[in-house]
Each structure stands twice: as C-alpha cells, then as structure tokens.
Amino acid sequence: MILQPIDYVVDAWIVLAVLSAAYVAFDQFRGNPEATVMKWGFVLVTLYMGPIGVLLYVMADKEPSPGTHEAFVAPLWKQSVGSTVHCVAGDATGIILAAILTALLGLPMWADVLIEYVAGFAFGLFIFQALFMR
C-alpha cells in the first residue's frame, strides 16, 4: 500500500481530534457545572470535529473563571450552540455506530441509510434525551 499525502493529513487530524477531545473531557469533568449530557455532548462533538470542536467549546461553554458559567452561557447564540451540540452528539453517535455495523455486515446501501436514520433518531431520543436528561 502506497501512502498518499492526504493520508498524513488524515492521520494528523485524527491525532488532533483525540487530543482536542481529551482536553475538553479533562476540562469538562474537572469542575464544569454543566449537566452531564452537555459534558458528554461537547466531548463527542469535539472528537468528531477536532480543533473546531475545541473552538466551539471555548467560545460557547468554557467559563472564563469559576462561578461565572450561568452568566457566560446566557447569550442566545451560546445557548443555540449548546442545543446544537446536544442534538449532534446524540444523533451523530447513533449514525456512526450504525455505519460501522452496516459496513461490517456488508448490507446494501438502502439498508445502510435506513438503519443509520433509525439509529441516529433512536440514540438521540432514547440515550441523549430520555436517559441523560434525568
């Protein structure tokens, strides 16, 4: 197998994504007063988006100093980012897990699309909404 230049870019992006998610996880679970579902949401979205996810986290959720989280996330655009992250984390996780499963099973594209849609919806609703929102 011959490596192409894009392979190095992809490898670097994966490393950056893992490091970014590790930073967000450390910061979120070290004392952020955010709900657990949002902590996991930002970690997962950062894992999927890499450094762009860190940028979203720092701009929209990381409190500048202890005790300022509520005031920091009060602007509507930050609440919108939080809502989007919450939804994307649940739905995307279901879709990614379903895509892995359907690829391993070698299912046809129509089944792949259907299973990914159902899994994304179900994972978002039953895990990120019902389970984590308690």
Predicted features and spans:
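Alpha-helical membrane segments of multi-pass proteins
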Residues: 1-134
